[in-house]
């Protein structure tokens, strides 16, 4: 089930707002440093490459609008097929979380490390089954022309698109989950306003894209740190 956030948020005018201004990185790091560094008690060891992953949350200004880049996984994959996510994957032995995120981004969509300015690490996110954790790395792509020369791995990625941050904030909502063992609520984001930079030939791309699950949790973290004066919430997320 999906529930909208408070009416107060829906009344906030965030159109045409700039989020990646001159002091954006410094403010982001200041907000990040104010968060307690404690880890989720169920997180697996960061040194276990078999159960540790990292992703890049790429920030980029497209057509004058500050945006977040996402990918849609190929429908031909065995797991999480067709889901919207950030580029990333499992850590190789000896890699740092940043190195993994940048390597996977290059392998999936062809954006090289030199094009990304790393802003910082968010709290690792744990999967409900507690079998692996994912560290989100926030990075800024200063030149949007990078998106004109994507080299997409069609075995893994169907589409690459960007969603303006003001659109994400306006469309933010909550999704309630219930299983035999637990109930929980996670942030989710439905967008009808996005720019497609790549889509595989003959593959259908829906007019609404939903960011939810772990990707929604990671996006929620990033928006909280980027725009705490606009993206206001009282949701306690149990997965980081």
Curated annotation (Swiss-Prot):
Amino-acid positions noted as binding Mg(2+) in the UniProt annotation, renumbered to this chain: 104, 108
EC number(s) given by UniProt: 3.6.1.-
Keyword Magnesium: yes
Disulphide-bridged cysteine pairs: none
GO biological process, one term: nucleoside diphosphate metabolic process
GO MF annotation, one: manganese ion binding
Gene3D superfamilies per record: Nucleoside Triphosphate Pyrophosphohydrolase
Residues spanned by motif Nudix box: 89-110
The entry's keywords: Hydrolase, Magnesium, Manganese, Metal-binding
Keyword flag Transcription regulation: no
InterPro entries referenced in this protein's UniProt entry, alphabetically: CoAse, NUDIX_hydrolase-like_dom_sf, NUDIX_hydrolase_CS, NUDIX_hydrolase_dom, NUDIX_hydrolase_NudL_CS
Domain spans labelled Nudix hydrolase: 50-190
Full protein name: Nudix hydrolase 3
């Amino acid at each position: 089930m999906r529930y909208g956030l408070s009416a107060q948020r829906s009344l906030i005018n965030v159109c045409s707002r700039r989020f990646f201004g001159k002091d954006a990185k410094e403010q982001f790091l200041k907000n990040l440093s104010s968060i307690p560094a404690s880890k989720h008690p169920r997180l697996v060891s960061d040194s276990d490459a078999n159960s540790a992953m990292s992703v890049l949350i790429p920030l980029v200004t497209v057509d004058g609008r500050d945006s977040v880049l996402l990918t849609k996984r190929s429908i031909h994959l065995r797991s999480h097929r067709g889901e919207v996510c950030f580029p990333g994957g499992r850590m190789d032995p000896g890699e740092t979380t940043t190195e993994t995120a940048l390597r996977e981004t290059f392998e999936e969509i062809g954006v090289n490390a030199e094009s990304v300015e790393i802003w910082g690490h968010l709290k690792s996110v744990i999967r409900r089954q507690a079998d692996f954790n994912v560290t989100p790395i926030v990075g800024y792509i200063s030149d949007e022309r990078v998106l004109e020369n994507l080299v997409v791995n069609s075995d893994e990625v169907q589409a690459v698109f960007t969603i303006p941050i003001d659109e994400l904030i306006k469309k933010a909502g909550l999704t309630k989950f219930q299983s035999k063992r637990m109930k929980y609520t996670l942030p989710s984001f439905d967008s009808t306003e996005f720019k497609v930079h790549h889509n595989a030939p003959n593959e259908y791309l829906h007019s609404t894209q939903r960011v939810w699950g772990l990707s929604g949790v990671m996006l929620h973290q990033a928006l909280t740190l980027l725009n705490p004066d606009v993206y206001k919430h009282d949701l306690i997320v149990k997965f980081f």
